[in-house]
Amino acid sequence: MGVIDARQLKTRGLDAQALTSLPRLSAQNLSLDPRLHDINLSVNAGQILGIIGPNGAGKSTLLHCLTGLLPHTGRSHLDDTDLTALSPRERARCMGLLPQQTDSVWPLSVHDVVSLGRLPWGDNDTTAIANAMRATGIETLAPARIDRLSGGERARVWLARVLAGQPRILIADEPTASLDLYYQQVVMDCLRTYANAGHIVIMAIHDLALAAHYCDQLLLLHNGVSQASGTPAEVLTESLLSQVFGVPVHVDLTAQPPVVSARFHRPVA
C-alpha cells in the first residue's frame, strides 16, 4: 500500500491538510508482564492500524490494554487527552470494542443488540442506530433474533452495535475470524469506510493479505515485543515474516489483491 500521499487521501475523502488536523492516538511503553513489553504506537484519524503476529504474540492483550480492560503500565493519549485517566464511561464513549467472541446468551432482536451501542451515552439515539444498521446493511434484519442469524450476519450486527456508539476510536479483535470470503470483504469495507470518515480504527488481524490491502500502518508483535512498525511495504517483508512466523514466506504486494503466504514444500516420500 505504501506511504499515503495527498492524492490517495483525496480518494478517501481526506486531504493532506485534513489529516494533520485530525486526532492522533499514541501509546507509550504499554506493558503487561509477561504478555506485553514496552509497546509504542501512533495512528492518525482516517487510518487503519493492523496489529499482526503469530498466535500468542500479544495482539488481543494490546487491544485490551488500549481499551482499559486489562491493567497495565504505560500511557495512551488521544491528542492531549490522557486516555488512561478517563473514567470507564468516558473511555467507552471514546473507544468502541468489537471483540472476537460475539455470541449472545439472550435471544435479543438485531435492533436491540445494535441499540446496546448507545449504553455509554445513556440514550436511544434512533438516528445513530439507523445509520449504523444502514452502514452494515442489516436494516431488513432488525426484527430477527440474533441467535438465528448466520455467522456473517451476526458479525455485521455486532459491528453495527459498535458503530451505533459513534466512537472516535474503533478497536476490533480479529473482525474477519471464521467469516467466508464474501463477509470478510463486507466487514473490512465497513471498517475502511469508518476510518475514511475521520475515525481511528485499530484491529488485530491474522490474514496478512487482508492487512496489506486494507491497513495504512502495521505493528508486528512476537512474544509480546514489537518487531516492526510502519506501512505494509515496510513491515511485510519476506525475511522478517519468515523469521517471526518460523516458515518461508512469499510476499507480493504489487499483486491485486496482495499476496502474503507460506511457501509450502512437497513432503519427502
What is the meaning of each model-derived region?
Residues 242-269:
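ABC ATPase nucleotide-binding domains
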Residues 52-54:
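The feature captures the beta-strand-to-loop junction immediately N-terminal to the Walker
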Residues 170-174:
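Catalytic Walker B motif of ABC-type/P-loop ATPase nucleotide-binding domains
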Residues 72-82, 91:
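Conserved ABC transporter NBD signature motif
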Residues 126-142:
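Conserved ABC ATPase "signature" region
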Residues 145-149, 153:
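Conserved ABC ATPase signature
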Residues 67:
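Helix-to-loop junction immediately C-terminal to a conserved catalytic motif
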